[in-house]
Regions:
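Hydrophobic alpha-helical segments
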Residues: 1-182
Length: 182
């Protein structure tokens, strides 16, 4: 059960309705997370900066690599909503998220995302070296900031117990325990 209910368009302020309309115009729908965040528009806008960083990284990394990175962070954090969201994107693209075929850069980003979520104090040197070989300092900072916003999104959804969006039901991420127990 969610910690707080989602906002409802019908009872929302004009400012919140504008954000709803903008999300529907851009994405065709509004997610449960965004509806929950819209209890506070500045909080909503802060989390939406994830899209700003995505748009900066997309020409450099591509959509698939960003989805792999986001999936690694989110599944490592056991975030039901975000893990399921990126699982769906990968599956819709023809991938098996549990058996990804990746190029070297995608594998590096997957490792980075996993390390960020599981043990950020001990990211191996080879990950940093691989990033330095491939990207400028500016891009590396953007990648790590993107991971940070992904972690923040994972945390928000988990702490607030936001309900899984219906469109994700068929792509539900198994918990770490469910994955361990097969």
């Amino acid at each position: 059960m969610p910690y707080v209910p989602m906002t409802e368009y019908e009872t929302a302020s004009e400012e919140v309705r504008r954000e709803y309309d903008d999300q529907i115009d851009k994405h065709g729908r509004i997610t449960n997370m965004k509806r929950t965040l819209l209890h506070n528009v500045p909080s909503f806008k802060a989390y939406m900066e994830w899209y700003t960083l995505y748009d900066e990284l997309q020409p450099v990394l591509g959509d698939r690599a960003l989805s792999i990175l986001s999936y690694a962070v989110s599944s490592g954090n056991d975030c039901l909503i975000c893990g399921s969201f990126f699982k769906k994107i990968l599956e819709d693209g023809g991938d098996d998220p549990d058996d990804l075929t990746m190029n070297e850069t995608e594998a590096l980003l997957h490792t980075l995302g996993t390390c960020v979520s599981l043990d950020p104090h001990n990211i191996p040197d080879y990950v940093y070296d691989g990033l330095k070989e491939r990207f400028s300092d500016e891009v590396i900072v953007t990648i790590v900031a993107f991971c940070g916003l992904m972690v923040a999104t994972n945390l928000f959804n988990t702490v607030m117990k936001v309900d899984l969006d219906e469109v994700l039901y068929n792509h539900k991420l198994l918990t770490k325990e469910e994955r361990r127990n097969g």
